[in-house]
Amino acid sequence: MEKKHVTVQIQSAPPSYIKLEANEKFVYITSTMNGLSYQIAAIVSYPEKRNSSTANKEDGKLLCKENKLALLLHGSQSHKNAIYQTLLAKRLAEFGYWVLRIDFRGQGDSSDNCDPGLGRTLAQDLEDLSTVYQTVSDRSLRVQLYKTSTISLDVVVAHSRGSLAMFKFCLKLHAAESPLPSHLINCAGRYDGRGLIERCTRLHPHWQAEGGFWANGPRNGEYKDFWIPLSETYSIAGVCVPEFATIPQTCSVMSCYGMCDHIVPISAASNYARLFEGRHSLKLIENADHNYYGIEGDPNALGLPIRRGRVNYSPLVVDLIMEYLQDT
């Protein structure tokens, strides 16, 4: 993997619009290569310290036997605290994990895209993940950021296009003979890129002739309009998903989809199940959409919380992820 100079700056306080738990810190991970620098904004959650003799499976708070990191990745026009990520970070830290949730460049509080004309391409996402991975592989960065000299990346949880980055990055790690995570959790990831092109054409009929389309998303504490160039969309649509099957068998995979997903067809769930047959766990949530909100008229049979007037299935997603990690 490419060598770059990576540094970590732990901030004394987060931006005013970000709330942290007592065990969390807001950080910038800075990468410099060939005279160019960029920053990845992240929140690190430190594990709950508990006496292992008091831990039991019933309370869902088993201490990890080794120092393990969980990395949380968001999707398109999103950020590090989106959907289930804040709650999942809390539960993972209670379980004994270090947790890092990041903003990809062009999103949240991270630096702008390297080339606005290209946008947030998948290649740029992979560069960001390479930078983040160096905080695990470099001993001095491990000590600075995670307060421990030994830690391994054990879990990656990714949503939507973040899942494609997760799987592609594992292929990159494998090619470099670097340690791979043991658990890969795909939340509503796309399987067939043609569906993305069709969706963009349906929502923005002239996007190809115009060279892209406008979207709205979180940027430095505000929702802003920004341009999505053709190259960004095609970098995702052109991914060869079947090659993910070559990820080593040591990586266990879980997929979680809302059965009323309005963005990614539910067929993606069964396609991933077949792709990773023998090491795949599939979870489907009735009445949930792409971001795990209930559809109109959802009876809320589970008594889940309501957010923005809709049933919020994120707590269930987190429960399913934690059950999977306890059982594998």
From Swiss-Prot:
Domain of life (superkingdom): Eukaryota
One annotated GO molecular function: monoacylglycerol lipase activity
Pfam families per UniProt: Hydrolase_4
Disrupted gene: phenotype observed: Cells are viable and do not display any phenotype.
A Gene Ontology cellular-component term: membrane
Protein name: Putative uncharacterized protein YDL057W
